[in-house]
Amino acid sequence: MSRWKLGLDGFVTHFMVSGPQEEPYFNEAKDKNQLRYEAYLRSVIAEHKPVGETGEILVGEKSRLNEEWKYYYDSGSCFVNISTFYSVMRRIHFDIATMLETSSDIDVTAALWSYAAVDVYCNGRLEGALKQPVYKPIQKKELTLHLKAGRNLIYLACENLGVRDTRSVAGLQILNHKDEIKVSIPDEACADAAAVAEAFLESARLESNKLCFDSSAPAGTSYTYRYHEEDFAKAKIPAVWYQAEGKNEILLENGQPYVTVKVVLGKLELKRVFERTEQLVPKYALREDGSAFSFEENKELIFRRIADVMSESRGEKFGFPISNILARKHFNDNSMDDERLMYEMLEMIEERYDCSDFLMCGLIRYLHNYPVEGAMKERIKDVMINYRYWMDMDGFDGMCFWSENHALMFYTCAMNAGEMYPDEYFPRAKMTGRELHLYGRNKVLQWLDDVEEYGFEEFLSTVYMCVTFAALINVVDYSEPEISKRAAAVTDKMLSMLALHTYKTGIVAPMGRVYRSVLYPFDQGAMALMNLINPKLPYTFGEGWLGFYASSHYPIPEGLVKLMEDDVETNYTTGNARVYLEKNDDYCLTSVASPREPFTRWENETLKEDVDITTHNFTKSFNERFHGTTYFRPGTYGYQQHMWYAALDGEASIFVTHPGSTSEEGDMRPGYWHGNGVMPALKQQHGLLGGIYVIPDEHPIGYTHLYCPECRFDEVIHEENWIFLRKETGYLALWCSEKLEAHNGMNFNCEQRAYSKNAAYLCVCGGKKSDVSFATFKKRAKETSPSYDKESKTLTAQEFELSYAACKDVTQFL
């Protein structure tokens, strides 16, 4: 029977998993403070029922949860991670089982890591527990496992509250006796098959147009190019799988950036996803002669692309169709069953799916522009009157109200819905339409006041700026003139910031919130906005948010293309952040200061007693707790903040993060590439950026990693602790205090890791204009003579100096 060694840093990496078991969850408790309310729900959701007899734990058989046991495989991961997004609230159970084998009786110290509530059993004995789930940061519990000679069943019973992005994650780290322990799985008959399938998948190498393996593919091996569909109608179509049994290489089609390889051996199924970085390229909409379309022509092309998608996919379960319907109405396009889609959408709004405010905002735009009669009119009225427009109104759901984009969505929806039905009574709000209109109007004004004074918290987010754009143009189009004018000015500011950070073919920017698209500046959602402004740029679908613009009178401001194209070296503030940007013909370097110069951050009101929870200031404070702070300081727990980039264009970019997850599976914030588990110290000056990453013992991931897609550069040189990069006339150099080691996960030849909890990086930028040649640049970069003192945590490079002093931010514990 196959056995495995412990993984990186002593983590157990081979498990069987049952679940998640998902049940509708309802709690009669009420609290107008949603922060306190969800904390309460997490405190009571875990039942901690004794596991009792587990029975035989076999792949394909049912567990005590009445869910099948599966062998868990996630290439490179140190955790079981079955995180996902829940649009409605759920009670979650999942069980994890593994076998630890030893030749003698030993007491082993282990660390349990999880966001869930977890009971840990060793041979049926409860050894320790995490009592309740948390949102963030991850919990750690040290415990003793009393192992007997032979096989020891380790059983983790996990419980969680499923609400929005839910971290169903657990890991077990062995802290001593590591060399005396081997790992297996309870299903002895499946262990050998699992080892064969896993060894085959782990041997994979992406080489040009083929995927190569060290051995022939086992029976039951197949592959597909299917990964993600923007159109929910297409997402429902089964993937096409191609047989690969007996092959030791798979020839891959051009234009297919994703390939998933699956091995099925009996009831055992393992998958690994590969991303072919070089196959992900900018998409242009140009005339046959290569010239750009006019603004008006390009705008129509944008609307056509959105109209051709039936419904924007929100995963495998449902789609959001309103942007697509709005685009089709622009063309008077009746080719799809939009009446059915509208009724399905109204049901989602009525059930108050998370993000149903997006649908409501689009519905309001629809009603302002297109007539509705009969049963549809009455159905819409009923849904709108009975909607929950804010978290202190009656109702139980898992909607996110408080992020910068969601808050404005809800505020403007309340303002507009109340105005549409002034004499109707809105029972959840306990207001008439006139009262709800004034309520929403007041909140919109508070939101505008805040952004005008402080700037955006979700600054430069290439995901959420698209959402905020849609909400803002609703305010522009459907508000009284003074409010409309202010909303237009804020929209102008948002687009100006994005234009300022548009470099050659992509948006290169630090961001308040980001997702995995951070790897591809040319393919980020907000490039849809930049392509609208400048048709010469690559386009993206941008989740179809520009469907709202098809019926808007908001004018794009002048001068944005010039902002994109001009050289600049500047810094500015937004939220609590100070952003640095330097861009020229050769390179772009941008970051947030961490820490920034002494200043007074805005006060988080959730930390105060007897605070007025009805104000937008409280909502903004609430958002900082959930979605991460813009008060960047070393040692602070991160969320979705992206802190720096160096780029030679929208494809050839690099950055370093401390990952929040050890693999790309599961819906994690922070993730493997987006966000940071713990924030570094950062300092930028002309052509130079230094970073110090110190990982505390309270965080389970003990390395940092560099994203460096070598296929995007014309020349790549590895030399001791340096990597030198050239593309056309631009040059980058990256130094690390640790020896960098290549790692291939979902992408190949894109990642370098520093296996240290205390490491420094120096990025040097240059180009032909300042350095004449690449060789001259290399010499100049080396002459900075970077040095890092681990004890004092100080990085020096000629006149450059940066020190690390760890900070703790109480707002980031939830």
Language-model features: locations:
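Short structured motifs
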Residues: N81-T84, D95-A97, I138-L143, A199, ...
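Aromatic-lined ligand-binding clefts that engage carbohydrates, nucleic acids, or primary amines
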Residues: T102, I106-V120, I154
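Beta-strand-rich ligand-recognition modules
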Residues: D119-G171
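Ser/Thr/Asn(+Pro)-rich, low-complexity disordered segments
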Residues: D192-N405, H437-V444, K536-L814
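Accessory carbohydrate-binding/adhesion or oligomerization-edge regions at the termini
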Residues: M1-S75, Y155-A197
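Extracellular polysaccharide-recognition and catalytic grooves
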Residues: D357-R578
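Extracellular and analogous surface-interaction loops
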Residues: R90-I92, I96-V108, T144-A149, S203-A204, ...
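Extracellular beta-rich ligand/substrate-recognition surface
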Residues: S83-H93, K131-Y135
